């Protein structure tokens, strides 16, 4: 048994599969978040293209940004629909990024507010990816055997995040998969729901319409941070981008999540749920 444990540790080191990197932005990306936030805010717009079609429901803009010899793309959107069946707002893009930072989840690319053509909107650094989940499914691309364990944990983190922010629009095009099989999450403009549908039940549980989709394995430190969240702390982090009602709804979901995690621990055992 000891030899097997040593062998597993060796494999993880050889393939560079440290747990935080399996489902998150690279450490250097996290360390440079302030740099990218400033870049998104201050860089000159030297190119622009409005995206349309099936994969661009909100018709966002792909902006080419340049500053100090560096050039990057940014995704800008200004949709702001507060009524109807599917409320949709650029403000929730920024709020989702800030909640991601608050929890040190590190799965959402840098996102800030920026004016474009005189309008307020959100702009997110363009995330480079090998494919989307849609491509993976349609082309029947298998997850490499030595990545399956980490890929599954990435999906558990995605479910955790979407449960908390009440994201009802996690379709296959906004799961971005990198060349080394990390998972990046984009498109959160249909999050932070306040209706009973999103405060009485969680989106991802064993009762999911497409079959059981549980938060089956989670970092203990992440669950501790979830427990430690306060409305005041969240308000300080998200600022004007969430209303008091949206924050209240998020904490109703937080409480449901803690109950769900306790349920999973009883079902599978604490050592199998928290790592």
Where are these regions (language model features)?
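C-terminal catalytic region of ATP-dependent kinase domains
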Residues: 66, 178-275
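Active-site acidic catalytic loop and adjacent metal/ATP-binding pocket
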Residues: 18, 63, 76, 153-193, ...
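Active-site-flanking segments in enzyme catalytic domains
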Residues: 25-32, 54-55, 69-83, 186, ...
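Soluble non-cytosolic domains of exported or imported proteins
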Residues: 87-94, 149-155, 244
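Conserved ATP-binding subdomain of kinase catalytic cores across diverse folds
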Residues: 42-145, 163, 167, 179
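Bacterial N-terminal signal peptides that target proteins for export
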Residues: 1-8
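Regulatory N- and C-terminal appendages and interdomain linkers associated
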Residues: 11-57, 62, 68, 244-275
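An alpha-helical support segment within catalytic cores of ATP-dependent transferases
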Residues: 139-162, 230
